[in-house]
């Protein structure tokens, strides 16, 4: 798989960020828009693409979009929460009251 085959987008109609490989959805992260934030609820990689690092790539894109839009991230999805723990450069996207959970 080449980077040229990968497309990342915010599919706002379906309330999810998508990563497509060759035009087909390979991974997605669902969210709900809440006041000033995106609440991430579920991230999934299709079985044919597991182990390729696509979920991490997708979440980095999603969190960059959250930052670009001036929003906060609410990581209810365990994968998104774990990603933020491993990448503290995104910790500022979590509202201050919720950051304690990431500082353990």
Residues covered by each model-derived region:
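Conserved N-terminal entry element of GNAT/NAT acetyltransferase domains
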Residues: 1-9
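Structural motif
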Residues: 11-13, 34
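Conserved beta-hairpin
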Residues: 15-26
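Residue-level recognition of conserved beta-strand positions in structured domain cores
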Residues: 21, 42-43
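Conserved beta-strand in the GNAT
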Residues: 24-32, 39
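A short, internal acetyl-CoA/4′-phosphopantetheine-binding micro-motif in the GNAT/acyltransferase core
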Residues: 44-50
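Conserved acetyl-CoA-binding loop-helix of GNAT-fold acetyltransferases
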Residues: 51-62
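C-terminal structural segments of small proteins and small subunits
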Residues: 68-103
């Amino acid at each position: 798989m080449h980077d040229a085959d990968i497309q990342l987008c915010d599919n706002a109609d379906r309330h999810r960020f998508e990563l497509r490989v060759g035009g087909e959805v390979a991974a997605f992260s669902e969210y709900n828009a809440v006041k000033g934030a995106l609440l991430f609820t579920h991230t999934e990689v299709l079985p044919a693409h597991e182990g390729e690092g696509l979920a991490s790539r997708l979440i980095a894109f999603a969190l960059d979009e959250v930052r670009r839009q001036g929003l906060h991230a609410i990581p209810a999805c365990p994968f998104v929460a774990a990603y933020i723990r491993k990448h503290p450069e995104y910790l500022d996207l979590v509202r201050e009251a919720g950051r304690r959970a990431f500082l353990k």
